[in-house]
Amino acid sequence: VACGSRPIILKPKEGLVYDNERVVYSKTVEAQNYLDAFKNIQLICKENGIDLIFVFPPNFQVFNSSFYDRFNKLVNRENKIFVYDTLNTVYKDKNYFYDGSHLTKGGAEIFTSELSVFINATK
């Protein structure tokens, strides 16, 4: 059994349409045990000198800023959050997505470049 990830070199799925619908995130869907686990992971990393970077990758839909706002409130200030370039029109082009959640090789190269710049700037 192979593990890990690999680039998707297949052509995008047919009928892929960018989702412009804005979704409002609600805290009512949160489970306290997950919130506690999230806080605990951050604490363990801090105690062990591990720098955390939380990454928001692109999906083939409008960025959920209400979820980001909630997430940002849960992240300890010493940790960092990277959000893909939401203004880059590439992320609205179906040719850079295999499906709604997975980038093609070309899309992954663009996203990886953005992430690399962010990581190098935080050193």
Pin down the residues of each PLM region:
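Secreted/periplasmic serine-hydrolase-like ester/acetyl group-modifying domain
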Residues: 1-44
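Short amphipathic alpha-helical segments, especially helix-boundary/capping motifs
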Residues: 15-18, 45-49, 88-92
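A short alpha-helix capping/helix-coil boundary motif
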Residues: 19-22, 49-52, 77
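A short, structure-level motif marking secondary-structure boundaries and short turns
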Residues: 25-27, 56, 100
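Acidic-and-aromatic substrate-binding clefts and catalytic sites of carbohydrate-active enzymes
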Residues: 29-32, 60-67
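Surface-exposed alpha-helical segments enriched in charged/polar residues
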Residues: 36-46, 113, 117-120
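Active-site segments of SGNH/GDSL-like serine hydrolases
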Residues: 39-64
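C-terminal regions of proteins
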Residues: 68-123
